[in-house]
Every structure is written in structure tokens, then in C-alpha cells.
Amino acid sequence: MPRSLKKGPFIDDHLLKKVVKAQESGDRKVIQTWSRRSTIIPEMVGLTFAVHNGRKFIPVFVTENMVGHKLGEFSPTRTYYGHAADKKSKAKR
């Protein structure tokens, strides 16, 4: 169920302060954040965020196509190695 339009997009206050500060100073430094739940707003376009995935920080450069999505969507938390293959089928090849 999507968020109510009258509430507006959710963004953590501390992250919003960092975004405003980066926009005012014109600084292109990477903004480190643990806030995966924050929605990407148009003011974030062009900035780079280091989003924590539980183990390390993944750099995410925000583009116009990402507006409306969450920061956590672009920082995967699980590593997929593929399904286990049968040893017999590998031996035949």
C-alpha cells in the first residue's frame, strides 16, 4: 500500500540537513547514511550517497530516474551466487 499523498515522501531529518548543506555549498562530497528507508527527492539528484547495506557502504549516484524510490533499493543486502548445480551433470559435460 503506497504512502498517503497528504503526508508526502518520508526522508530522515538528519539526511535532509546533509542534502541541504551540500546543495548550498555546492560540495560534491559523498554523503554517508544508514537511512535506507528515506525516499529520494528531486533535491538529491546529482549527489552521491554511501548507503549502508549491513556490512559496508555502497556508493549510489542519484539520477532523475531514481526519484520516488528508496535509497535502500540501490544497495543490495544479500549476495546471490546462483543455484547449486548437480555434481553429476557437471561431470558429464
Swiss-Prot record:
GO terms for biological process: ribosomal small subunit assembly; translation. It comes from the Bacteria. GO terms for cellular component: cytoplasm; small ribosomal subunit. Keywords: Ribonucleoprotein, Ribosomal protein, RNA-binding, rRNA-binding. It holds the Pfam family Ribosomal_S19. InterPro entries: Ribosomal_uS19, Ribosomal_uS19_bac-type, Ribosomal_uS19_CS, Ribosomal_uS19_SF. The keyword Nucleus does not apply. PROSITE patterns: RIBOSOMAL_S19. One of its GO terms (molecular function) is rRNA binding. HAMAP family: Ribosomal_uS19. Belongs to the universal ribosomal protein uS19 family. Protein S19 forms a complex with S13 that binds strongly to the 16S ribosomal RNA. This is Small ribosomal subunit protein uS19. It comes from Maridesulfovibrio salexigens (strain ATCC 14822 / DSM 2638 / NCIMB 8403 / VKM B-1763) (Desulfovibrio salexigens). The lineage of its organism: Bacteria, Pseudomonadati, Thermodesulfobacteriota, Desulfovibrionia, Desulfovibrionales. The gene is rpsS.
